[in-house]
Curated annotation (Swiss-Prot):
Record organism: Pongo abelii
Extracellular face of the membrane: 85-108, 152-155
Protein name: Tumor protein p53-inducible protein 11
Gene responsible for this protein: TP53I11
The organism's place on the tree of life at top rank: Eukaryota
Topology of this chain in the membrane: Multi-pass membrane protein
Disulfide cross-links: none
Phosphoserine modified-residue sites: S14
Length: 189
C-alpha cells in the first residue's frame, strides 16, 4: 500500500487577498486619518509627526507677524534692561521712576519670551506656533489690563498711553486670528 501524499501546500499571497491587505493596512496605520484630519503614511510618520500639509498651506502673513513680534519683544526687552528710565517715561509720560529693578525684571522676562518667539519663527510644527501665538495674545491682553488699571489708579492720560492701549488690543486680535488660522482643519479637496 502506498501512502497517500498530502496535497501540495498552497502559498497564500497576501497581496491578492483583499481581507488580508486591509488587515495589514490597519495594523501598519497606512491611509487612516488622525484626530486632526491628516492622513499618515505609516506609524513612523505618526510618531515623528507629519506636518507636510501645513508647510504648504500657511496663513498669509504668519511668518511676517512672527518676525515682527520677535523684533518687538527683543527691542522692548533690551530697552527695559538697558534704559529703564526712558522706557517708563515713554509709556507714562514724565512720571518719576521709583525703582529700576521691576522694569529690568520685566525686561528679563520679555527677553525670555523673545527667545521663544525667535525659535518659533523657524519651526513648522503647528502646536509650537499655536502656543507661541497664544502666549503672545495673553501677554498683550495682560499688559492692556495692567496699563488700564494703572490709568484708573493714577488718573494719568496721554496720547502715548492711548496709542499703547490701542496697539495692544490690535496685537491681541492679530495673535488670536493667527492662532485660529493655524489650528484650522484643512479643507477637503
Amino acid at each position: 500500500m502506498a501512502a497517500k501524499q498530502p496535497p501540495p501546500l498552497m502559498k497564500k499571497h497576501s497581496q491578492t487577498d483583499l481581507v488580508s491587505r486591509l488587515k495589514t493596512r490597519k495594523i501598519l496605520g497606512v491611509g487612516g486619518e488622525d484626530d486632526d484630519g491628516e492622513v499618515h503614511r505609516s506609524k513612523i510618520s505618526q510618531v515623528l509627526g507629519n506636518e507636510i500639509k501645513f508647510t504648504i498651506r500657511e496663513p498669509l502673513g504668519l511668518r511676517v507677524w512672527q518676525f515682527l513680534s520677535a523684533v518687538l519683544f527683543s527691542g522692548i526687552a533690551i530697552m527695559a534692561l538697558a534704559f529703564p528710565d526712558q522706557l517708563y517715561d515713554a509709556v507714562f509720560d514724565g512720571a518719576q521712576v521709583t525703582s529700576k529693578t521691576p522694569i529690568r525684571l520685566y525686561g528679563g522676562a520679555l527677553l525670555s519670551i523673545s527667545l521663544i518667539m525667535w525659535n518659533a519663527l523657524y519651526t513648522a510644527e503647528k502646536v509650537i506656533i499655536r502656543w507661541t501665538l497664544l502666549t503672545e495674545a495673553c501677554y498683550f491682553g495682560v499688559q492692556f489690563l495692567v496699563v488700564t488699571a494703572t490709568l484708573a489708579e493714577t488718573g494719568l492720560m496721554s496720547l502715548g498711553i492711548l496709542l499703547l492701549l490701542v496697539s495692544r488690543l490690535l496685537f491681541v486680535v492679530i495673535s488670536i486670528y493667527y492662532y485660529y488660522q493655524v489650528g484650522r482643519r484643512p479643507k477637503k479637496a
